[in-house]
């Protein structure tokens, strides 16, 4: 990005604004609270407390145009091979809508719709049985997205199915889950793109044995034959996914089977509709008014121009407590790259470390560092305007904390006692959902997906591969025989010492 024509001008704006006080920016642009706000369907965004001004934003958008960001979105939605290292499209948007006239994307949408009908039919079959509990086994993109949505949108009581998620290869996770369930009233879903994932195969074997066979086992995989063979699952209970959808973008596909069981099929479709509506905003809105573009460019500004190494996400709605973990994978697996599309080294830092938690709990853990630490951490604060629980006073208190914390981080407070002085200057974006509905959550997740793509285009990297996860898995596979007491050639001296300790 530093080699773009407009970078020097952008850098000059950063030098000018790095030490600027956020109240001074607001005073210089009196209309800033509304001019830097956007409403897209059920989502409201306010960027007024970010440390840029109109001139800096114009320079950012100039580089976005130089990077052909609008064309990059067209290529994404039309099903061109934007995943160049694996020579694949990235058609997660086609799982939820048909927004272009491109045959590849339209065919993908039709295929996904057919599979979704199969999901609905399987749910109807399960509703006619005595099954009350579902154990969903997957990891990474096969777990984090479904787990987030099911937890966020499940009814407080009265759901037809209780869905339990197991991901970790640690047997304690499966043991604790199964200890509360009756195998005669439980079904299992095994989700793995390749059906070669160690965690899913090991946990799937435990579940298969506990259930007493495969009669109530289902699978979702891009390798359906392997899935059916591994656990003797009838082909009619194996749902496909495709290599043109990455795992972390796959909750909209049959990977969402446990979501539909947890919240109901109709509400699952509403989730997809919400995402598709936000997709339409991204595809059809000029860059300057495009919220996903502004969110992504803000992340680039904070990372590359202001030097922020981390980014925090705080969800002021307990039902969204799993969102930071989901975003960690979406953002860091997509953008944790050190080479560009052509294999050359990047010319600027890429992804920040994303982390966070649920408010107000986090105010009593890491907010001390946000307010008075030496690192400036940009943040997203996410809340809901309306809440449907019966405790209205609690919701008022929750939203008061959103307003108070963002103001305190931005403005700070002087004190004659340096220990009680708040420097301020901490930027944040506030995102408010009208209410936590399936449509709103779908739109929110879509926004973050597209923000990630914006950043990848600006940095010239591939957001859709993840080769960095492979080496550790390969080494773990090679070390398994040694841990079982078999002879193995282990070259690394530290690993040899640790093996000796583990083997006693």
UniProtKB/Swiss-Prot annotation:
Q: Which InterPro entries match?
A: G6P_Isomerase (IPR001672), G6P_Isomerase_C (IPR023096), Phosphoglucose_isomerase_CS (IPR018189), SIS_dom_sf (IPR046348), SIS_PGI_1 (IPR035476), SIS_PGI_2 (IPR035482)
GO terms in the biological process aspect are: gluconeogenesis; glucose 6-phosphate metabolic process; glycolytic process
**Top enzyme class:** isomerase
Q: Where is this gene product found?
A: Cytoplasm
Pathway note: Carbohydrate biosynthesis; gluconeogenesis; Carbohydrate degradation; glycolysis; D-glyceraldehyde 3-phosphate and glycerone phosphate from D-glucose: step 2/4
Q: What is its main location?
A: cytoplasm
Give me the reactions it catalyses.
alpha-D-glucose 6-phosphate = beta-D-fructose 6-phosphate
Gene3D superfamilies under this entry? 1.10.1390.10, Glucose-6-phosphate isomerase like protein, domain 1 (3.40.50.10490)
Q: Which SUPFAM superfamilies match?
A: SIS domain
State whether keyword Cytoplasm applies: yes
Q: Identify the GO cellular component terms for this protein.
A: cytosol
The active site of this protein is located at: 333, 364, 473
Entry EC number(s): 5.3.1.9
Which CDD domains does the record cross-reference, listed alphabetically?
SIS_PGI_1, SIS_PGI_2
Q: What keywords appear on the UniProt entry?
A: Cytoplasm, Gluconeogenesis, Glycolysis, Isomerase
Cytoplasm is among the record's keywords = yes
Report a single Gene Ontology molecular function: glucose-6-phosphate isomerase activity
Tell me which family the UniProt entry assigns to this protein: Belongs to the GPI family.
Role summary: Catalyzes the reversible isomerization of glucose-6-phosphate to fructose-6-phosphate.
Q: What is this protein called?
A: Glucose-6-phosphate isomerase
* Organism of this sequence: Xanthomonas campestris pv. campestris (strain ATCC 33913 / DSM 3586 / NCPPB 528 / LMG 568 / P 25)
């Amino acid at each position: 990005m530093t080699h773009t024509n407009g970078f020097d001008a952008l850098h000059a704006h950063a030098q000018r604004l790095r030490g600027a006080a956020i109240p001074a920016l607001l005073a210089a642009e009196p209309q800033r609270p509304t001019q830097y706000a956007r409403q897209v369907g059920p989502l409201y965004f306010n960027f007024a407390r970010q440390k840029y001004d109109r001139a800096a934003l114009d320079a950012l958008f100039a580089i976005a145009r130089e990077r052909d960001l609008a064309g990059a979105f067209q290529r994404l939605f039309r099903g061109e091979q934007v995943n160049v290292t694996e020579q694949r499209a990235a058609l997660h948007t086609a799982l939820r809508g048909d927004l272009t006239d491109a045959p590849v994307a339209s065919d993908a949408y039709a295929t996904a719709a057919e599979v979704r009908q199969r999901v609905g039919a399987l749910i109807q079959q399960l509703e006619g049985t005595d099954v009350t509990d579902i154990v969903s086994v997957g990891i990474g993109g096969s777990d984090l997205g479904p787990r987030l949505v099911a937890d966020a949108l499940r009814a407080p009581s009265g759901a037809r199915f209780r869905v339990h998620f197991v991901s970790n290869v640690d047997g304690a996770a499966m043991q604790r889950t199964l200890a509360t369930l009756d195998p005669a009233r439980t079904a299992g879903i095994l989700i793995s793109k390749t059906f070669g994932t160690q965690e899913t195969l090991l946990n799937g074997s435990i579940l298969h044995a506990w259930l007493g066979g495969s009669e109530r086992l289902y699978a979702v995989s891009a390798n359906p034959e392997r899935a059916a063979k591994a656990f003797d699952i009838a082909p009619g209970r194996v749902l496909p996914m495709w290599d043109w959808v990455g795992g972390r973008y796959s909750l909209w596909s049959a990977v969402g089977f446990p979501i539909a069981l947890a919240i109901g099929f109709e509400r699952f479709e509403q989730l997809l509709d919400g995402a598709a509506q936000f997709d339409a905003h991204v595809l059809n809105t000029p860059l300057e008014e495009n919220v996903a573009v502004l969110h992504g460019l803000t992340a680039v500004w904070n990372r590359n121009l202001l030097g922020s190494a981390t980014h925090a996400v705080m969800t002021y709605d307990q039902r969204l407590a799993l969102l930071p973990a989901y975003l960690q994978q979406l953002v860091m697996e997509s953008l944790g790259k050190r080479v560009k599309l052509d294999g050359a080294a990047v010319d600027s830092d890429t992804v920040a470390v994303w982390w966070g938690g649920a408010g107000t709990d986090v105010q009593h853990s890491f907010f001390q560092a946000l307010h008075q630490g030496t690192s400036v951490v940009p943040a997203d604060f996410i809340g809901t305007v309306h809440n449907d629980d019966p405790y209205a006073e609690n919701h008022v208190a929750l939203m008061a904390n959103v307003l108070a914390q963002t103001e305190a981080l931005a403005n700070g407070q002087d004190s004659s006692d340096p220990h009680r002085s708040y420097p301020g200057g901490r930027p944040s974006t506030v995102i408010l959902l009208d209410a936590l509905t399936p449509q709103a959550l779908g739109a929110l997740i879509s926004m973050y997906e597209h923000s990630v793509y914006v950043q990848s285009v600006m940095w010239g990297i591939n957001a859709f591969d993840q080769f960095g996860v492979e080496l550790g898995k390969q080494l773990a596979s090679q070390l398994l025989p040694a841990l079982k007491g078999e002879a193995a050639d282990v070259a690394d001296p530290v690993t040899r010492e640790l093996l000796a300790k583990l083997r006693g």
